[in-house]
Amino acid sequence: MEGAEGNAGQPGPAERSHRSSVSSVGARAADVLVYLADDTVVPLAVENLSSISAHELHRAVREVLQLPDVALEAFALWLVSPLLEVQLKPKHQPYKLGRQWPELLLRFTNASDDDVAMDEPSLQFRRNVFFPRRRELQIHDEEVLRLLYEEAKGNVLTARYPCDLEDCEVLGGLVCRVQLGPYQPGQPAACTLREKLDSFLPAHLCKRGHGLFAAFRGRGAKTGPGEQGLLNAYRQVKEVTGNNSEREATLGSHYRAYLLKCHELPFYGCAFFHGEVDKPAQGFLHRGGRKPVTVAISLEGVHVIDNREKHVLLGLRFQELSWDHTSPEEEEPVLWLEFDGDSEGTPVNKLLRIYSKQAELMSGLIEYCIELSQAAEPTLSQESASGPHEAPSPSPPPTQRPKLRRQGSVVCSRIQHLSTIDYVEDGKGIKRVKPKRTTSFFSRQLSSSQGSYTVVQPTDDSLEQS
């Protein structure tokens, strides 16, 4: 996609609806509908729809919502459909991109001709992938915090952000506080939570068991594990103390608390892409196959998420990987991720291939995020050298869970569930054949920081040559 930011992926279930952002077109003016994260609509009457830029529409949305200047960097306009998501650059013309949508679908998705013909994007006002988390912590405007909160909540509830149960309960408790008000002892909170459980917890955590025991449990008033944890988290939500007891000010602190908790997730604020990876060979016939994954890319790194199991398969900072993409004729495009690992105690380089028609977009986004990170390093160094500054709202460090609990966390890598190509520099393969690689492959890495990816030298003559 020429000039695009390159953010594409599969939207969550809440976004899987066909809706147009152009409600009526006249000779000169048109009503453009811009959707917010909570599915509310901002109607805009614009002149010269075919030539208006994303920057101009972005400014119009900010004026209608009366957002401060920070919203210019915190949010971006997106074209979103059930098949593809694209973050727009300020210079892009949304109407023209909308007209080109079928071409983009054919280029970057595996959608059928019928699906392409039926698909229609909507214009959405969402978080900018390139907005740093540290800047987000400095925001105090109530409406900006609310919009960020609504988007993060949607990603948690649709499991685009995989979370451990205890984290989901904490986040769900904050949602309860926002939607139901302060917890009041004695109120029928358990019944209310049970009726709206999917409004507070991801759907896969709301499924009840089946069978005889589930039937008996349903007759009583006892809550399930998720419900009880959610209720406890709701009780423990801290209220803001002070003279200002206005509801908006109180909610602002809970929006911020929700976002701070989400900042613990390594893939918060990512762009999402669709792909597939090879499964490890299993069984007598060593059959593998593929599994669908979501590739999440942010300013910090890359995460590969199992769509079915809702957990991370691989998480890498940019300092820990090298990458490339290939698009050979008559073959599937592939994003290659190369990183350090070991094979039965032997240090090796591991190579993961992600099959995706969006490989080109992912590779471009990785390269751009690295450029932004390198450009930001001098600025951060100058800020550190200028002396300590008082933070406007310092947050307490997150409490670390016991080590054994963390090992099973959904955000921990599960490399054993991936089929990788293991090798050393001179091409000696470990159990698999080293594929042909482009000459620029090792050069595409962030090697200026400590702990960077390194090429493993062959040290053991017993390595199997495939």
Swiss-Prot record:
Residues 1-21, 379-409, 442-466 are annotated as: Disordered. It comes from the Eukaryota. Disruption phenotype: Mutant mice are viable and fertile. It is found in: Cytoplasm, Cytosol; Cell membrane. Residues 442-460 have a biased composition (Polar residues). CDD domains: FERM_B-lobe. Residues 391-400 have a biased composition (Pro residues). InterPro entries: Band_41_domain, FERM/acyl-CoA-bd_prot_sf, FERM_2, FERM_central, FERM_domain, KRIT1/FRMD8, PH-like_dom_sf. GO terms for biological process: positive regulation of tumor necrosis factor production; protein localization to plasma membrane. Promotes the cell surface stability of iRhom1/RHBDF1 and iRhom2/RHBDF2 and prevents their degradation via the endolysosomal pathway. By acting on iRhoms, involved in ADAM17-mediated shedding of TNF, amphiregulin/AREG, HBEGF and TGFA from the cell surface. Negatively regulates Wnt signaling, possibly by antagonizing the recruitment of AXIN1 to LRP6. This is FERM domain-containing protein 8. The lineage of its organism: Eukaryota, Metazoa, Chordata, Craniata, Vertebrata.
